[in-house]
């Protein structure tokens, strides 16, 4: 009987230990999941602005004198046309009172340089746009994007701010005309590294990570 009692006692003790281990395991998993959720939510909350881009609405006139530099009106003319000037003219049309070259240069920095290529591709796809004026939403530069997403930065002293008081006044005029909006930042997922922050994306990193994992898996199997 003594042996049976000892066996029963040891079995009960083992079951209690197993139950405790299960509880500890579940608590460990629950703790890990909780911290993972906290980290992910923190990333989303802090980085959600990266998923949005700022766009400015402008009346864009595809001036044939700028686009076609030769009498033949060749496709090569479109590829080498000065679309930066077209964007400058569009901004100047919105602010006709600005005539100073320095101020015009600052104003032209409101729009991302990537839009020059986008306009070129647009005209190549539809050459009938030459000579026409259409309304387009153009991607804003990184500094305008940052200020637009963070209104509190407007309260910072001019010397510590990304843009001057004059540029801030222009931005407020654009806002007053409802010519600014935030849209989903698709470039973040389809573009790679860039020297221009508003054009940077994670595509290159994703592809690199995929192939790294792929090669690792291939080499890890016999």
Where are these regions (language model features)?
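Membrane-topology segments of multi-pass transport proteins
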Residues: 1-24, 30, 43-199
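Charged, alpha-helix-enriched surfaces in structured cytosolic catalytic cores
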Residues: 15, 35, 201, 205
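Alpha-helical transmembrane segments of integral membrane proteins
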Residues: 25-28, 32, 207, 211
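Transmembrane alpha-helix signature in integral membrane proteins
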Residues: 200-222
């Amino acid at each position: 009987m003594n042996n049976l009692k000892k066996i029963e006692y040891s079995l009960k003790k083992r079951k209690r230990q197993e139950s405790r281990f299960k509880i500890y395991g579940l608590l460990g998993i629950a703790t890990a999941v909780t911290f993972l959720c906290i980290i992910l939510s923190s990333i989303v909350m802090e980085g959600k602005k990266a998923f949005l881009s700022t766009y400015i609405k402008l009346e864009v006139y595809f001036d044939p004198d700028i686009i076609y530099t030769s009498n033949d009106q060749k496709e090569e003319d479109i590829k080498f046309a000065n679309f930066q000037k077209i964007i400058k003219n569009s901004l100047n049309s919105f602010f006709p009172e600005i005539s100073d070259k320095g101020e015009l240069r600052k104003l032209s920095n409101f729009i991302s340089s990537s839009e020059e290529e986008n306009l070129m591709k647009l005209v190549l796809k539809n050459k009938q746009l030459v000579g026409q004026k259409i309304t387009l939403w153009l991607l804003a530069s990184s500094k305008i994007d940052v200020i637009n997403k963070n209104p509190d930065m407007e309260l910072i002293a001019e010397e510590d701010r990304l843009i001057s008081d004059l540029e801030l006044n222009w931005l407020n005029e654009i806002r007053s005309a409802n010519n600014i909006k935030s849209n989903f930042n698709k470039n973040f997922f389809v573009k790679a590294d860039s020297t221009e922050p508003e054009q940077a994306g994670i595509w290159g990193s994703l592809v690199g990570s995929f192939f790294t994992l792929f090669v690792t898996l291939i080499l890890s199997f016999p």
